[in-house]
């Protein structure tokens, strides 16, 4: 049980302390409740670009990374469809440096054309390297646009295309920052060797002077219920054929989500999994098979995927059928309580070992705070899952009319 202390500043910033005296270090994590889903459909990639711009300096801090490094620290960030996260790790006795730097860019980010052009080039190159030059690099683009027809999850975090990034202006960036990067839309968490009293005192000193301001309302178009199967074939620079079957499902923290998480573990996690025992040894066409879920706050997806040793269309069709049959079997041949217990224990071990690291804890606690979860009880919803629930949720999700099939074939030209 982790002793988590909390307070909220007058401007709405939630401040969380996780005191750990076993280390000489500390992590300062700032999580903003904004992500790619808050972009316009013709200006995608903006949230990720702004993440980069947050390191370009603020009014009183010209060199964010340089000042942090001089205090013995490092920093980084990530953007998802739902959130944007910034973190710094440094010796606990220098913790105030991180507070000063984070507060200054929350209050007064330096918007200028030079930094925008520099980071635009960096992000555009990142797009090319990750999405255009890597085998299966554009899988997320194709799969999201196949599964989501109206919801903003239909584009990836990096953006639909480089052209969107190219036309983002300084005014667009400034407006997005003003709409979303407010203290009341963020969580500040400190994990490590900094007592709660000092965390709250420093938060008051450096963040309380940032004025509260309203954030832009969120009004996403709801994804309609899928009533017919969809498919897409891509001929690309890939080493082998891949097949992905994606099924729409409910978002994070719903009962369906927790059960689906266990379903994918039973299907593909480890040598005792259904895919490993029933697909890989008996069928040499499968090079690998996997099952996973997209843990988004709003609509998610359950994915069944495989890489194949045979590049023929017939092999792809056969693999898709076998993936579907094996997953559907959970609805007709109930799993055992022992299988569920093993899956829950694996998940609990993963959570426990992951939280041994103070940086991982800082990020996880920040996320659970924004999601209004009890961090110390995150495993509890899984403990009551039954074989009957697994069968029921399998029937709800794995349905022929909800299939979204994406097949990659190696280019032959």
Regions found by a protein language model. Name each.
Residues 1-24:
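N- or domain-start disorder-to-order transition segments that initiate the globular core
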Residues 2-4, 8, 66-215, 222, ...:
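Charge-rich, well-structured scaffold segments of protease-associated domains
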Residues 3, 24, 82, 227-230, ...:
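A generic structural signal for well-ordered coil/turn residues at beta-strand boundaries
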Residues 14-16, 27-31, 87, 187-189, ...:
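Soluble periplasmic/extracytoplasmic beta-strand elements of cell-envelope proteins
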Residues 20, 29-31, 145, 215-276:
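His/Glu-based metal-binding/catalytic segments typifying zinc-dependent metallopeptidases
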Residues 24-26, 194:
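Active-/binding-site microenvironments in catalytic and ligand-binding cores
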Residues 27-89, 155-157, 269-285, 298:
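M16/MPP (pitrilysin/insulinase) zinc-metallopeptidase core fold and M16-derived inactive scaffolds
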Residues 43, 95, 99, 256-260, ...:
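Short, charged, low-complexity patches
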